[in-house]
């Protein structure tokens, strides 16, 4: 499987239009962006560049998962009762997204919480999560590129996504 950079760009444009349309009349004053994993940063940056007139200031928030399994945000925390958009690279078992959603609801009581994922892995979900928008369905294989690393922690910098063996 290989998803080319052109296919990614086309899908980003499509997702950005759908997300822009969704938020056009729904936001009061703020849209908080949460990017759970490092692998989602290129997707988030490219997607946010294409989102038009979201109706609010955008706040880019990322997190790290510390040793005690607590969510630690870099930058500022979401504000209570704000709209939150989670931008995730891959939805596989649903554990990470489910835990993050629970945490955000408990700590910040968002007025609206939506999720966009680049990849939806065809795998048995341990936790079902309502995904608002998704880019591509992929098989249950290790994928890398476009921010996601391979088994050796490399190849994040590739402009495409693949699961093919590399020499």
Q: What residue spans do the PLM features occupy?
A:
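PRPP-associated nucleotide enzymes
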Residues: 1-167
């Amino acid at each position: 499987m290989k998803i080319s950079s052109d296919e990614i760009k086309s899908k980003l444009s499509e997702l950005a239009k759908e997300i822009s349309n969704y938020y056009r009349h729904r936001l009061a004053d703020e849209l908080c962006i949460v990017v759970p994993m490092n692998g989602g940063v290129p997707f988030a940056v490219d997607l946010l560049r294409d989102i038009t007139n979201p109706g609010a200031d955008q706040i880019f928030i990322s997190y790290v998962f510390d040793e005690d399994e607590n969510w630690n945000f870099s930058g500022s925390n979401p504000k209570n009762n704000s709209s939150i958009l989670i931008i995730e690279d891959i939805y596989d078992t649903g554990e990470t997204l489910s835990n993050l959603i629970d945490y955000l609801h408990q700590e910040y009581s968002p007025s609206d919480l939506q999720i966009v994922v680049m990849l939806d892995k065809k795998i048995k979900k341990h936790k079902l999560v309502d995904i608002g928008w998704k880019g591509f369905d992929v098989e249950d294989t290790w994928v890398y590129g476009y921010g996601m690393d391979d088994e050796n922690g490399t190849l994040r910098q590739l402009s495409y996504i693949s699961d093919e063996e590399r020499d």
